[in-house]
């Protein structure tokens, strides 16, 4: 495998297929399908859109060129208020175990969101970084749906303002967070 990407997914069939189709073919994709308590049925359309079904003990997933690991945490819901963060951690823990067991010969775990629109030339390669660097945040831009441009601009300014404020204060945590 050329790498691994973890994608937490909840009730996002429309945008997820576009994201998956832009991932490199040699990439292991870990989909952690999750739902909060009481919303377990919300992923039915997602499973249908991906055409997730067992075949000889292995799941086939439409729209993904490379190997895929589907972790279904929607039938056993995640605890309240831990959804996307815990789903991302579950996927990263699985990838880390595969790396530690030398099943997955890569050095980086990438993560994105199911509702992200990736650029057409998107590639997840091991970045060239200085020793001691353990995490990177890729440049991002939020594209607002019609009528929400001002709200999205304020949201993105708030994200950057938070990080810049931490940097100005000399904090070692001056980086964007992910859910």
List the predicted regions and their residue ranges.
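Short acidic, S/G/P-rich loop/turn micro-motifs used as interaction or catalytic elements
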Residues: 11-15, 36-38, 77-78, 115-122, ...
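Active-site-proximal specificity loops/subdomain of glycosyltransferases
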Residues: 40-106
């Amino acid at each position: 495998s050329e790498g691994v990407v973890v994608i937490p997914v909840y009730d996002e069939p429309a945008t997820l297929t576009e994201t998956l189709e832009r991932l490199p073919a040699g990439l292991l994709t870990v989909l952690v399908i999750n739902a909060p308590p009481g919303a377990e049925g919300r992923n039915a359309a997602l499973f249908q859109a991906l055409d997730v079904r067992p075949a000889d003990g292995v799941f086939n997933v439409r729209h993904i060129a490379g190997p895929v690991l589907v972790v279904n945490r929607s039938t056993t819901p995640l605890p309240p208020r831990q959804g996307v963060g815990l789903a991302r951690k579950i996927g990263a823990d699985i990838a880390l175990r595969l790396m530690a067991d030398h099943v997955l010969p890569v050095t980086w775990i990438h993560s994105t969101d199911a509702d992200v629109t990736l650029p057409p030339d998107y590639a997840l390669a091991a970045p060239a970084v200085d020793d001691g660097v353990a995490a990177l945040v890729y440049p991002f831009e939020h594209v607002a749906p019609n009528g929400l441009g001002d709200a999205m601009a304020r949201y993105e300014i708030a994200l950057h303002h938070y990080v810049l404020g931490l940097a100005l204060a000399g904090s070692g945590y001056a980086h964007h967070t992910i859910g």
